[in-house]
Amino acid sequence: MSEAVFFVENAEELAKQKMDNINPELSEKFQLLIKFLSRFPESCSNPRSKQVRKNFGKAEHIEYLAQNFNESRLPKKPTPPTTIPDEVVSLVLNVSFDIPQENLNRIKEEHRLSMASENIVGDLLERYLAEKLEPCGWIWCSGTSVKAVDFIHYDNEKDEWGLLQVKNRDNTENSSSSKIRDNTPIKKWFRTFSQRDATNWENFPDEVSSKDLNEDDFRAFVESYLRKIK
């Protein structure tokens, strides 16, 4: 992180200007994100670019965040990994699990596709929740712009922030962060259990949404979304 861990005074104005040039439909949401990061700059994810890090909280950094915020909302297809598979895995399948030699190439390819599918489920979950929560005033922190937080909400009357972190499974690595600087708690929720065949929708935080969020609706969203971009 840059030594200057703060955002410039006109950060919200810059946020609107930058997003107006990229996608005006997201300007209000992005402004709210920058409002949050201006108050809690230590919660901002560390930019990959050294040049952007040098200009933390300034116009160049805000434009970088705006581009990521927008691009992460564009349709995203499952992409099989490009890594070369380890042939010893096939050997283990053949010897230890009695998988016939003629089936190994098919299994290898299906494993690649399965990995691609598994890797995108978390993104699909966030997109589904964004569709449900953003009309209620929550903002999807697309572009991994905020550490340990996926959705934020601002109560203007109380000047209070709501923070939500979502995970696809209960054994997915979670950030150890449970609060931000002013002791605002980060609500945490996961969708599925790793040790039993069950989902966790019934425990979605009531204070976040009163909408009927459930597994059937999520699966319908996933199927519709993937068919549109196929």
Curated annotation (Swiss-Prot):
EC number: 3.1.21.4
An annotated GO BP: DNA restriction-modification system
Keyword Cell division found: no
GO molecular function, one term: DNA binding
Keywords: Endonuclease, Hydrolase, Nuclease, Restriction system
Catalyzed chemical reaction(s): Endonucleolytic cleavage of DNA to give specific double-stranded fragments with terminal 5'-phosphates
Annotated protein name in UniProt: Type II restriction enzyme SinI
Lineage: Bacteria, Pseudomonadati, Pseudomonadota, Gammaproteobacteria, Enterobacterales
